[in-house]
Each structure stands twice: as C-alpha cells, then as structure tokens.
Amino acid sequence: MVCHHKGMTTDFFVDIWSDVVCPFCYLGFRQFHDALDLFDNAEDVVIRHHAFELDPHAELTHGQSLNEMLAEKYSMSLERAAAMNQRVEDTARELGMEWSLVDARPTNTFNAHRVIALAATHGLQEAMLERLFRAYFSEGLVISDHDTLGTLAHEIGIDGVDEMLAGNQFVDAVRHDESLAAKIGLTGVPALILDGRVHVSGAQGSSAMLEALEDAWSQRSQQTA
C-alpha cells in the first residue's frame, strides 16, 4: 500500500495506520499533508497507508447515530456526546473541512480497507482514502455498502469493485496490516512511523507533524553522515 508523494531519489518511508471512520485519522491526514507541504525534503517521502479497524466486529448496518454510539460506548449523556462531536467538527472546520457528524453512519470498515488496497494497485491509495473519509464524515454515506464503495471508487477512476468484493482479493492485505500493527504494539490510530524511527500518535497538529518529519530526517542524516 504505497503512495509516492513526488519523484524520489532516496526513499523516506512514512507508514500510517488509520481507520476510515476515525475522526482523528481524517484530522491527522489533513494535518500531515499540511506539514508535508512545508517539509523541505517532501520529494523523498513515500507514504504507505495501512489498514486498522477500530471495531472489527462492527455491524454492516448500524441503527445508532454516531452520537448515540459514543454515548453508549463511554457511558455518557447524549448531550455530552453531541458536544464532543461538535468540538471535533469545529477542529475540522479550522482545517478547511465541513463535517456533519450528526449524519455519520457507523459501520464495519473491512471492505472499505479492501477497496483502499485495490486503489493502491492503481496508484490511487490516498485519493481513495480521502474520498472515503469525505463520504463518511461529510456526506453521511454508509461506506460498507458495496454499491456505495463501487460508486466512490469509480469517481476516482477505479472499476471492478463489485467483482473484487465478491471474492477474497485484498483480504490478506488488510489482515497483514492489522497483524503488523499488533506486532508493533499499536493500539490506537492515527499512528505514524516516520522513516522507521520516529513515532507520532494522534492528530497532534501540522506543526507537531512537521517537527516530527524534520526530527526523523535529522536522525537519518546523522546516521548516514
């Protein structure tokens, strides 16, 4: 699962684990790319996205809203859950994104990750990931629905999703990503590993992301000096 940012001379891998229904993953996605725009060595960056399921046992069709699910999961009032989601929406708006979490439909994300893996074979991994983020957080689409996944993939130039989902393609790829996360000890997302040496957890902001990129590059330079 690889996305080349630009033409590279020396690969500087950035491995990112995320789930498409994780708000902080979408925030972190945008923050990382804002940081990358300011990183002097961005042309050497190779982005590798990896699958992570926050709830592998989530149902395909979920009757609860995101607010209701959050309230139940953390034993809080519906009003408090709504207020928490509003704060997240406000943060997204500061990054130029318009979310509607009241319309978000919690669902299983395994097949969405398979579609992202398919997109990677076309060099469209990040485009697919971002499209799924937007579908879930801004458009209230059910991103486990096969027709929806096929439509979203077609929008960015990928066909054959129905046939892929009917079989077992990319099942092993998703499971491999999740096994690797467990082996590394990752328990939450977003999780970034920069050049195999600097770890970043959570959506810490573009400034922190840029600092981490520069730190990893500095360590790399010292090692090769």
Spans of features found by a protein language model:
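Short intrinsically disordered, low-complexity coil segments enriched in acidic
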Residues: 1-2, 90
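C-terminal cap of thioredoxin/glutaredoxin-like
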Residues: 3-17, 24-41, 49, 116-225
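Structural alpha/beta surface segment adjacent to cysteine/selenocysteine redox centers
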Residues: 29-136
